[in-house]
């Protein structure tokens, strides 16, 4: 009986908290213990009722779960027995309200289902006028600027190669949206004037946009439109009607009305151009490629203030710029579509005065065009004569006046009185041929006149040619008016330049075994009136040098029979034996016997010849060392720049004139007599 009492006593002091109804059973249990009959059945029933009441109250009150299911009463008397086995408290939050300050698995830092780790959402995007959308992944904190970067990675060739991510435009087509959108989203976006699309700003959250515009999910036909900042054609530019619209107005103008307003605007501009008498020369414009990408900041942004509601608008842009060829009576229904050229268009000579305030204007004229003819025609018109009719050819390459055509052709034809014109034409052709390094036959003035004049690019040679032709025609005007050319002009044309005075006195020996290089160097020297001879090997070069009269030798190193290094050593040895140049007394013995074949005349050889080594070898450093050691004065590597070679020849000629001034002066005197 004591065992049962102690067991019930332990159960009452155990870690299971019981309800008051359970404690009411203890007096009954003590009374049964004091009886003599040992009613085991009653005791068992009472214990079962107590266990049932304890299990019923466990769902309401917190439970204290012991780490050990069965312990003896002696455990609580051990040292540190209860300290090592602290109970764990578990509570349920099923029926308690959730407040924002409490820590839940959804907002816990250590939770695995936070917003930062949410799976990305797919966003459909597509390029305009295409039916093949694709998807990109966007996370919860991504904005439109991040979406642009994903689009560039998705289109690496068509968009990423030509455009930056920051320049892209992301639009939503409102025609595909069936759910009304909150007005707050409309305020932060920009609505384009003529289409039902919204431009998304870079700082908008992508997930928020998807929730607002596509609450039921985004389908493939709801793809966002990705536009690149390409230049729009002329019919999509702002017109005076659309330029005066308010920024907040979303009024839609039909396409037919916009076309009619654009047509009226072009007619007004053409009338203004005709009133200003800005006549333009018609030239074919180069077509712009379709894939040309121009930034929005580089496009022709039409200024709203430049338009006015008056009937006769006169924009300041028309005054500063030359007239576009599209305004010269070309029909809008023409099958040939002309795109706007962003370079300065070609203008006529009459509009040169209007371009004085525009320093960026470029004037391209034909080769045989003269401003003096137009000035004379304007003077005749202002004096009261009947104006000549201006005719434009079909290709638009030149303009001809009926009255002045015969006069110009007569001036361009060669005669006995315009010798200066022929001389200048030959000098001009010689200058052009010198750049190419090949000799060409000069064309006759009749062929130049009969050939069709084409617009020339603005280069140094074309500018020189245009200036020379205009000056020659103006000089011919003075010649025809006076009857005879002035002797001072003829004398100035025939006087040699300082370069011509120096260069003809030089005699060059070209030692080259390649026929092509011989032809190039020969043509180069002939155009500059330099006397030269060609040797094909080293032995032939020595034989020709012994005849005398050479100031410069262009020696190729790799030669047959005898190399250039060996030929240079032999030439320097012969100069040393014949005491040509300045040598020390100890270098040459006094009793040296010179053979007759090695003897050189002192009248012919006054100074050592300048030898320049030429090579095309890859091992140029070794060849240069060997050439300079053998006695060469300079070293050149092929291919040689002809302009640089001309400057070096001038330098070497001046050097020879200083060394042998008497011989150079005598030779120059003989050339003048001849």
From Swiss-Prot:
An annotated GO BP: regulation of filamentous growth of a population of unicellular organisms
Disordered, as annotated region: 66-115, 259-354, 372-497
Sequence ranges assigned to domain Response regulatory in this UniProt record: 507-653
Biased composition (Basic and acidic residues): 90-99, 391-416
Alphabetically ordered keywords of this record: Phosphoprotein, Stress response, Two-component regulatory system, Virulence
GN (gene name): SSK1
SUPFAM superfamilies per UniProt: CheY-like (SSF52172)
Bias-annotated ranges (Polar residues): 66-75, 101-115, 302-314, 323-336, 434-444
Biased composition range(s): Low complexity: 264-276, 343-352, 372-383, 422-433, 459-481
Protein name: Oxidative stress response two-component system protein SSK1
Species per Swiss-Prot/TrEMBL record: Candida albicans (strain SC5314 / ATCC MYA-2876) (Yeast)
Database matches in InterPro entries: CheY-like_superfamily, Sig_transdc_resp-reg_receiver
Record's note on what induces expression: Expression is detected as early as 1 hour after infection of reconstituted human esophageal tissue and increases thereafter up to 48 hours postinfection.
UniProt note: phenotype after gene disruption: Leads to flocculation, attenuated virulence towards reconstituted human esophageal tissue, and to hypersensitivity to fluconazole and voriconazole.
Residues annotated as transmembrane: none
Record's function text: Final receptor of the SLN1-YPD1-SSK1 two-component regulatory system, which controls activity of the HOG1 pathway in response to oxidative stress and probably also to the osmolarity of the extracellular environment. Involved in cell wall biosynthesis, hyphal growth, and virulence. Regulates the expression of CHK1, as well as of a subset of genes whose functions are associated with cell wall biosynthesis and adaptation to oxidative stress. Provides at least partial adaptive functions for the survival following encounter with human neutrophils.
Any one GO molecular function term: phosphorelay response regulator activity
Protein family per UniProt: Belongs to the SSK1 family.
Keyword Phosphoprotein: yes
Positions carrying 4-aspartylphosphate: 556
Keyword Phosphoprotein (UniProt): yes
